[in-house]
Amino acid sequence: MRTMGRFVAIFFVMVAVPTVATTPQEPPLTVEVRHYARSLQPGEVVRVTATFSRPVRAVRAAAFGSVVPFQPTSDQRIWSGLVGIDLDVEIGEHLVSILGTSPDGTTARTGHPLAVKSKEFATRRLTVAPEYVTPPDEVIERIQREGARTTKLFNTQTPTAHWRGAFLRPVTGEATSAFGRRSVFNGQARSPHSGADFRASKGTPVKAPNSGVVVLANDLYFSGNCVIIDHGLGLYSFFAHLSRIGVSEGDRIASGDIIGDVGATGRVTGPHLHWTVRLNTARVDPLSLMAVLSNGG
Protein backbone atom coordinates (compact mmCIF):
# COMPACT_ATOMS: atom_id res chain seq x y z
CA MET A 1 0.00 0.00 0.00
CA ARG A 2 2.85 2.38 0.65
CA THR A 3 4.18 1.86 -2.81
CA MET A 4 0.75 2.54 -4.24
CA GLY A 5 0.49 5.68 -2.16
CA ARG A 6 3.80 6.99 -3.41
CA PHE A 7 2.77 6.24 -6.98
CA VAL A 8 -0.51 8.12 -6.59
CA ALA A 9 1.24 11.07 -4.95
CA ILE A 10 3.87 11.30 -7.67
CA PHE A 11 1.27 10.96 -10.39
CA PHE A 12 -0.74 13.77 -8.81
CA VAL A 13 2.22 16.10 -8.72
CA MET A 14 3.05 15.40 -12.35
CA VAL A 15 -0.42 16.23 -13.62
CA ALA A 16 -0.76 19.23 -11.31
CA VAL A 17 2.22 21.08 -12.84
CA PRO A 18 1.21 22.38 -16.29
CA THR A 19 3.65 22.49 -19.15
CA VAL A 20 4.56 26.14 -19.95
CA ALA A 21 5.30 26.82 -23.63
CA THR A 22 8.10 29.41 -23.92
CA THR A 23 8.16 31.73 -26.91
CA PRO A 24 11.70 32.57 -28.05
CA GLN A 25 12.40 36.28 -27.69
CA GLU A 26 13.31 38.39 -30.73
CA PRO A 27 16.99 39.35 -30.71
CA PRO A 28 17.71 43.04 -30.07
CA LEU A 29 17.14 45.32 -33.07
CA THR A 30 20.50 46.64 -34.24
CA VAL A 31 21.60 48.84 -37.13
CA GLU A 32 24.82 49.24 -39.10
CA VAL A 33 25.33 52.45 -41.09
CA ARG A 34 27.65 53.15 -44.01
CA HIS A 35 28.05 56.05 -46.41
CA TYR A 36 29.38 56.61 -49.92
CA ALA A 37 30.54 59.92 -51.42
CA ARG A 38 33.22 61.32 -53.71
CA SER A 39 34.42 63.28 -50.70
CA LEU A 40 32.99 64.85 -47.55
CA GLN A 41 33.27 68.50 -48.58
CA PRO A 42 30.88 71.39 -49.22
CA GLY A 43 28.67 70.73 -52.25
CA GLU A 44 28.90 66.95 -52.12
CA VAL A 45 26.10 64.38 -52.09
CA VAL A 46 26.37 61.47 -49.64
CA ARG A 47 24.42 58.24 -49.93
CA VAL A 48 23.79 56.82 -46.44
CA THR A 49 22.69 53.20 -46.04
CA ALA A 50 21.28 51.72 -42.81
CA THR A 51 21.15 47.93 -42.50
CA PHE A 52 18.94 46.64 -39.67
CA SER A 53 19.18 43.18 -38.09
CA ARG A 54 15.55 42.53 -39.03
CA PRO A 55 12.86 44.33 -41.05
CA VAL A 56 11.65 47.73 -39.84
CA ARG A 57 8.47 49.53 -40.80
CA ALA A 58 9.77 53.10 -40.62
CA VAL A 59 13.01 55.07 -40.52
CA ARG A 60 13.38 58.67 -39.40
CA ALA A 61 16.62 60.45 -40.20
CA ALA A 62 18.05 63.96 -40.11
CA ALA A 63 21.32 65.68 -40.98
CA PHE A 64 22.53 69.28 -41.08
CA GLY A 65 19.24 70.47 -39.60
CA SER A 66 17.04 68.89 -42.30
CA VAL A 67 14.87 65.79 -42.42
CA VAL A 68 16.45 63.14 -44.67
CA PRO A 69 13.92 60.79 -46.30
CA PHE A 70 14.99 57.13 -46.26
CA GLN A 71 13.61 54.52 -48.66
CA PRO A 72 13.57 50.73 -48.07
CA THR A 73 14.54 47.78 -50.20
CA SER A 74 11.99 45.02 -50.74
CA ASP A 75 12.74 43.18 -47.48
CA GLN A 76 12.56 46.36 -45.31
CA ARG A 77 15.94 45.62 -43.71
CA ILE A 78 18.09 47.95 -45.82
CA TRP A 79 17.14 51.63 -46.06
CA SER A 80 19.01 54.45 -47.77
CA GLY A 81 18.82 58.21 -48.16
CA LEU A 82 20.69 61.09 -49.77
CA VAL A 83 22.37 63.78 -47.68
CA GLY A 84 23.48 67.09 -49.17
CA ILE A 85 26.45 69.04 -47.77
CA ASP A 86 25.67 72.71 -48.43
CA LEU A 87 28.23 75.22 -49.69
CA ASP A 88 28.16 77.15 -46.42
CA VAL A 89 28.27 74.20 -44.03
CA GLU A 90 30.42 74.48 -40.91
CA ILE A 91 33.60 72.45 -41.29
CA GLY A 92 33.97 69.59 -38.79
CA GLU A 93 32.08 66.52 -37.64
CA HIS A 94 28.33 66.29 -38.16
CA LEU A 95 25.95 63.45 -37.33
CA VAL A 96 23.30 61.73 -39.40
CA SER A 97 20.73 60.68 -36.79
CA ILE A 98 18.81 57.52 -37.66
CA LEU A 99 15.87 55.91 -35.84
CA GLY A 100 14.37 52.64 -37.07
CA THR A 101 11.12 51.15 -35.75
CA SER A 102 10.20 47.48 -36.19
CA PRO A 103 6.61 46.22 -36.63
CA ASP A 104 6.44 45.32 -32.91
CA GLY A 105 7.51 48.82 -31.87
CA THR A 106 11.13 47.99 -31.04
CA THR A 107 13.52 50.78 -32.01
CA ALA A 108 17.18 51.13 -32.91
CA ARG A 109 18.83 54.53 -32.84
CA THR A 110 22.29 55.69 -33.91
CA GLY A 111 24.28 58.73 -34.97
CA HIS A 112 26.56 58.24 -37.97
CA PRO A 113 29.46 60.74 -38.16
CA LEU A 114 30.36 62.69 -41.30
CA ALA A 115 33.65 64.56 -40.95
CA VAL A 116 33.32 67.48 -43.37
CA LYS A 117 36.60 68.88 -44.67
CA SER A 118 37.23 72.33 -46.12
CA LYS A 119 37.48 72.99 -49.84
CA GLU A 120 39.01 75.87 -51.73
CA PHE A 121 36.91 77.23 -54.60
CA ALA A 122 38.34 79.24 -57.46
CA THR A 123 37.08 82.71 -58.41
CA ARG A 124 35.65 83.58 -61.81
CA ARG A 125 35.48 87.15 -63.13
CA LEU A 126 32.85 87.93 -65.74
CA THR A 127 31.56 90.98 -67.57
CA VAL A 128 27.80 91.14 -68.08
CA ALA A 129 25.23 93.80 -68.92
CA PRO A 130 25.14 96.46 -66.14
CA GLU A 131 21.45 95.83 -65.37
CA TYR A 132 22.35 92.32 -64.19
CA VAL A 133 24.80 93.68 -61.60
CA THR A 134 22.81 96.69 -60.42
CA PRO A 135 19.20 96.00 -61.42
CA PRO A 136 16.99 99.07 -62.05
CA ASP A 137 14.41 99.94 -59.41
CA GLU A 138 11.49 98.81 -61.56
CA VAL A 139 12.63 95.16 -61.51
CA ILE A 140 13.53 94.85 -57.81
CA GLU A 141 10.03 93.72 -56.85
CA ARG A 142 10.10 91.12 -59.65
CA ILE A 143 13.45 89.76 -58.47
CA GLN A 144 12.20 89.48 -54.89
CA ARG A 145 8.98 87.77 -56.01
CA GLU A 146 10.88 85.26 -58.15
CA GLY A 147 13.34 84.56 -55.35
CA ALA A 148 10.53 83.92 -52.86
CA ARG A 149 8.85 81.51 -55.28
CA THR A 150 11.95 79.42 -55.96
CA THR A 151 12.85 79.36 -52.25
CA LYS A 152 9.37 78.06 -51.42
CA LEU A 153 9.72 75.33 -54.05
CA PHE A 154 13.12 74.19 -52.79
CA ASN A 155 11.79 74.11 -49.22
CA THR A 156 9.01 71.70 -50.24
CA GLN A 157 9.77 68.03 -49.65
CA THR A 158 7.49 65.84 -51.77
CA PRO A 159 6.94 62.61 -49.76
CA THR A 160 7.43 60.20 -52.68
CA ALA A 161 10.36 59.59 -55.01
CA HIS A 162 9.69 60.37 -58.68
CA TRP A 163 13.22 59.47 -59.75
CA ARG A 164 14.81 56.06 -60.07
CA GLY A 165 18.42 54.97 -60.59
CA ALA A 166 21.25 57.02 -62.05
CA PHE A 167 20.94 60.61 -63.28
CA LEU A 168 21.72 61.30 -66.94
CA ARG A 169 23.88 64.09 -68.30
CA PRO A 170 21.41 66.65 -69.74
CA VAL A 171 23.73 67.55 -72.65
CA THR A 172 26.86 65.87 -74.00
CA GLY A 173 29.12 68.92 -73.62
CA GLU A 174 31.83 69.07 -70.98
CA ALA A 175 31.47 71.03 -67.76
CA THR A 176 33.01 74.47 -68.29
CA SER A 177 32.41 76.30 -65.02
CA ALA A 178 32.84 74.34 -61.83
CA PHE A 179 30.35 74.22 -58.99
CA GLY A 180 31.10 76.53 -56.05
CA ARG A 181 33.27 79.07 -57.84
CA ARG A 182 33.13 82.52 -56.29
CA SER A 183 31.63 84.93 -58.81
CA VAL A 184 32.71 88.49 -59.55
CA PHE A 185 30.49 90.33 -62.04
CA ASN A 186 31.81 93.62 -63.42
CA GLY A 187 34.21 93.82 -60.48
CA GLN A 188 31.53 93.19 -57.83
CA ALA A 189 31.45 90.01 -55.75
CA ARG A 190 28.24 88.03 -55.92
CA SER A 191 26.98 84.72 -54.50
CA PRO A 192 28.91 81.53 -55.37
CA HIS A 193 28.15 79.56 -58.51
CA SER A 194 25.66 77.04 -57.10
CA GLY A 195 25.43 74.86 -60.20
CA ALA A 196 27.48 73.45 -63.04
CA ASP A 197 27.75 74.93 -66.54
CA PHE A 198 27.97 72.70 -69.61
CA ARG A 199 29.31 73.60 -73.02
CA ALA A 200 26.57 73.55 -75.66
CA SER A 201 25.54 75.66 -78.63
CA LYS A 202 22.26 77.54 -78.82
CA GLY A 203 19.38 75.26 -79.73
CA THR A 204 20.92 72.06 -78.33
CA PRO A 205 18.12 69.89 -76.83
CA VAL A 206 18.23 69.55 -73.04
CA LYS A 207 17.27 66.16 -71.58
CA ALA A 208 15.66 65.61 -68.20
CA PRO A 209 18.32 63.86 -66.08
CA ASN A 210 15.67 61.75 -64.37
CA SER A 211 11.90 61.54 -64.00
CA GLY A 212 9.88 64.07 -62.05
CA VAL A 213 7.24 66.79 -62.13
CA VAL A 214 7.78 70.23 -63.67
CA VAL A 215 7.07 72.77 -60.92
CA LEU A 216 8.35 75.88 -62.71
CA ALA A 217 8.64 76.73 -66.42
CA ASN A 218 9.06 80.46 -66.81
CA ASP A 219 11.33 83.42 -67.50
CA LEU A 220 13.21 84.68 -64.43
CA TYR A 221 15.21 87.91 -64.36
CA PHE A 222 18.66 86.48 -63.62
CA SER A 223 18.13 82.90 -64.84
CA GLY A 224 16.29 83.67 -68.08
CA ASN A 225 14.08 80.92 -69.44
CA CYS A 226 14.26 78.12 -66.91
CA VAL A 227 12.72 74.83 -65.85
CA ILE A 228 12.60 73.34 -62.34
CA ILE A 229 11.92 69.62 -61.94
CA ASP A 230 10.80 68.11 -58.63
CA HIS A 231 12.32 64.62 -58.48
CA GLY A 232 10.69 63.97 -55.09
CA LEU A 233 12.04 63.56 -51.54
CA GLY A 234 13.48 67.09 -51.54
CA LEU A 235 15.56 66.64 -54.72
CA TYR A 236 15.26 69.32 -57.43
CA SER A 237 16.91 70.09 -60.79
CA PHE A 238 16.98 73.71 -62.02
CA PHE A 239 17.94 74.44 -65.65
CA ALA A 240 18.59 78.05 -66.66
CA HIS A 241 19.32 80.33 -69.65
CA LEU A 242 17.26 78.24 -72.10
CA SER A 243 16.39 79.61 -75.54
CA ARG A 244 13.16 77.61 -75.51
CA ILE A 245 11.05 76.03 -72.78
CA GLY A 246 9.56 72.76 -74.01
CA VAL A 247 7.43 71.76 -71.00
CA SER A 248 4.67 73.22 -68.86
CA GLU A 249 4.20 73.39 -65.11
CA GLY A 250 2.51 70.24 -63.86
CA ASP A 251 3.93 68.02 -66.61
CA ARG A 252 5.15 64.59 -65.53
CA ILE A 253 8.33 63.79 -67.39
CA ALA A 254 10.49 60.72 -67.80
CA SER A 255 14.26 60.44 -67.76
CA GLY A 256 15.61 61.60 -71.11
CA ASP A 257 12.58 63.67 -72.13
CA ILE A 258 13.41 66.96 -73.88
CA ILE A 259 12.55 69.88 -71.59
CA GLY A 260 13.87 72.74 -73.74
CA ASP A 261 16.84 74.03 -75.72
CA VAL A 262 20.15 75.59 -74.67
CA GLY A 263 20.27 79.37 -74.92
CA ALA A 264 21.75 82.58 -73.56
CA THR A 265 18.87 84.25 -71.72
CA GLY A 266 19.25 86.05 -68.40
CA ARG A 267 22.61 86.96 -66.83
CA VAL A 268 25.07 85.18 -69.15
CA THR A 269 28.09 85.84 -71.34
CA GLY A 270 27.13 83.32 -74.02
CA PRO A 271 25.15 80.15 -74.78
CA HIS A 272 25.55 77.28 -72.30
CA LEU A 273 23.47 75.09 -70.00
CA HIS A 274 23.37 75.87 -66.30
CA TRP A 275 22.20 73.01 -64.05
CA THR A 276 21.57 73.54 -60.35
CA VAL A 277 20.64 70.75 -57.92
CA ARG A 278 19.01 71.29 -54.53
CA LEU A 279 18.81 68.44 -52.03
CA ASN A 280 16.66 69.24 -48.99
CA THR A 281 17.59 72.91 -49.60
CA ALA A 282 21.34 72.16 -49.71
CA ARG A 283 23.20 73.48 -52.77
CA VAL A 284 25.05 70.50 -54.18
CA ASP A 285 27.13 69.74 -57.27
CA PRO A 286 25.16 67.99 -60.05
CA LEU A 287 28.29 66.01 -60.94
CA SER A 288 28.43 64.69 -57.37
CA LEU A 289 24.81 63.56 -57.61
CA MET A 290 25.54 61.76 -60.88
CA ALA A 291 28.61 60.06 -59.42
CA VAL A 292 26.91 58.86 -56.23
CA LEU A 293 23.81 57.49 -57.96
CA SER A 294 25.76 55.83 -60.75
CA ASN A 295 27.48 53.79 -58.05
CA GLY A 296 24.56 51.60 -57.01
CA GLY A 297 22.11 54.51 -56.56
Task: Describe these PLM feature segments.
Residues 25-43:
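N-terminal edge beta-strand
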Residues 44-53:
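Aromatic/hydrophobic beta-strand junction motif of beta-rich domains
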Residues 79-97:
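Ligand-binding face of N-terminal immunoglobulin V-set domains in extracellular IgSF glycoproteins
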Residues 99-103:
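Beta-strand-rich extracellular modules
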Residues 168-297:
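Catalytic cores of peptidoglycan-degrading enzymes
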